[in-house]
């Protein structure tokens, strides 16, 4: 019986109790726009599609704690069925639903032929995020992250 209780405690901690986000802050759409422009993620042939007028952001450290808890990256990749765009949509939706952070964008990168996320933080510049393997990416790091043509939906 003790082993079952221990296993349930681990399950509760790992899958039910989400990390606390003590740094959640409200920002307006113009602040988000300036962050994206300053970081070079929008402009030219990369357009932003606005979703909200108010956004909630957190520190990168708190967001990293969320990523360690989230299991989107554990999904199985199935070409043309559950692929890059599905991972990116799912991760964005989970951030909205589970932790109330809506400053996670969906990037449709036509130049790279890929879809992924972009996260705006309260304490550091926005960064690109690959939800398939929980990794941070730099613009231009590889041919999949060129972001010279496409959309940032945020």
Predicted regions located by residue number:
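A structural boundary/capping signal
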Residues: 1-154
């Amino acid at each position: 019986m003790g082993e079952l209780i221990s296993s349930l405690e681990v399950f509760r901690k790992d899958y039910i109790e989400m990390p606390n986000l003590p740094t959640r802050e409200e920002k307006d759409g113009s602040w988000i726009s300036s962050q994206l422009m300053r970081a070079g993620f929008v402009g030219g042939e990369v357009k932003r599609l606005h979703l909200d007028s108010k956004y909630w952001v957190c520190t990168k450290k708190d967001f990293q704690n969320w990523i360690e808890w989230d299991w989107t990256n554990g999904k199985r990749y199935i070409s043309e069925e559950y692929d890059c765009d599905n991972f990116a949509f799912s991760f964005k939706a989970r951030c909205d639903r589970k932790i109330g952070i809506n400053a996670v964008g969906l990037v449709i990168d036509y130049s790279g032929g890929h879809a992924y996320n972009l996260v705006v933080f309260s304490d550091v510049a926005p960064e690109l995020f690959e939800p398939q393997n929980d990794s941070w990416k730099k613009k231009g790091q590889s041919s999949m992250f060129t972001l010279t043509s496409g959309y940032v939906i945020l």
